[in-house]
Amino acid sequence: MSTQGFLKPRSIEVEPVGTHHAKIVMEPFERGYGHTLGNALRRILLSSMTGYAPTEVQMTGVVHEYSTIPGVREDVVDILLNLKGVVFKLHNRDEVTLVLRKNGAGTVVASDIELPHDVEIINPDHLICNLTEAGKVEMQIKVEKGRGYVPGNVRALSEDRTHTIGRIVLDASFSPVRRVSYAVESARVEQRTDLDKLVLDIETNGVISPEEAVRQSARILMDQISVFAALEGAGDSYEAPVRGTPQIDPVLLRPVDDLELTVRSANCLKAENIYYIGDLIQRTENELLKTPNLGRKSLNEIKEVLAARGLTLGMKLENWPPLGLERP
């Protein structure tokens, strides 16, 4: 079947909005293709971009994350949260262990981390902790390359390592895309007024630019769709490569707290043993409405936050829950 009759975008514009934030406008598309491609690209941008994140930390004198360090204003939990906000970029390597040492009164920021020549920090002024006169902090930070969001407990079980006292495994958010949304507007070509204009609004953490993020997501989509092109022709056959353990969308492994629901809605879900987004999307509207103290208003709130992530209630998941997923 020929696809020559389908319109392709003749105009692609990148409109900078701020630092690492841009709108990418493409037109024209055949009617309906704006939503078809916009939603697909958005979901890939949110879940499948490769980035870098701290995955393990060892601090001198610290046994576990609920400790405190003498002379340091923040406790260890706050320090770890601040470390997660440091944006790393590795060149020509997949992992690295970095060292941070500092003592004496003052602030400790990302630029105080000792870096080899092929590691870069995008936000060097990011605060890690504050020290008093007697304060001292020394730590090793392991940074890895990865994709999506991987909870620390899942990764710790999949990595057959001997547990070291003081080794703290972090939840890792590798995605360099902080926010993405799309809108479809009307476009016109000559006498045709029923066409689509796609506007992608993308903000990244600086590891990649918004336009590079779109290029990478498009390549991923093309690679996945190419499998279906092999079905063309009755005599042709295609043998898909054998896969190992089924992959779970990293978004589904996030706790429902990440949806930023109201306290009432979040507590109602946890009372029904719904702790992860993957648990939630498998419930139907009727099932949730039977939950004590969860009314129509809370249900609408849940549906809205799921829709913003391209998800709905009543979805079916295979191989859920994944092996090693902990329940609170």
UniProtKB/Swiss-Prot annotation:
HAMAP family: RNApol_bact_RpoA (MF_00059). One of its GO terms (molecular function) is protein dimerization activity. DNA-dependent RNA polymerase catalyzes the transcription of DNA into RNA using the four ribonucleoside triphosphates as substrates. The N-terminal domain is essential for RNAP assembly and basal transcription, whereas the C-terminal domain is involved in interaction with transcriptional regulators and with upstream promoter elements. Belongs to the RNA polymerase alpha chain family. Homodimer. The RNAP catalytic core consists of 2 alpha, 1 beta, 1 beta' and 1 omega subunit. When a sigma factor is associated with the core the holoenzyme is formed, which can initiate transcription. It catalyses: RNA(n) + a ribonucleoside 5'-triphosphate = RNA(n+1) + diphosphate. Residues 1-232 are annotated as: Alpha N-terminal domain (alpha-NTD). This is DNA-directed RNA polymerase subunit alpha. One of its GO terms (biological process) is DNA-templated transcription. Residues 248-328 are annotated as: Alpha C-terminal domain (alpha-CTD). Pfam families: RNA_pol_A_bac, RNA_pol_A_CTD, RNA_pol_L. SMART domains: RPOLD (SM00662). One of its GO terms (cellular component) is DNA-directed RNA polymerase complex. It is an enzyme of class 2 (transferase). InterPro entries: DNA-dir_RNA_pol_insert, DNA-dir_RNA_pol_RpoA/D/Rpb3, DNA-dir_RpoA, RBP11-like, RNAP_asu_C, RNApol_insert_sf. Keywords: DNA-directed RNA polymerase, Nucleotidyltransferase, Transcription, Transferase. Its EC number is 2.7.7.6.
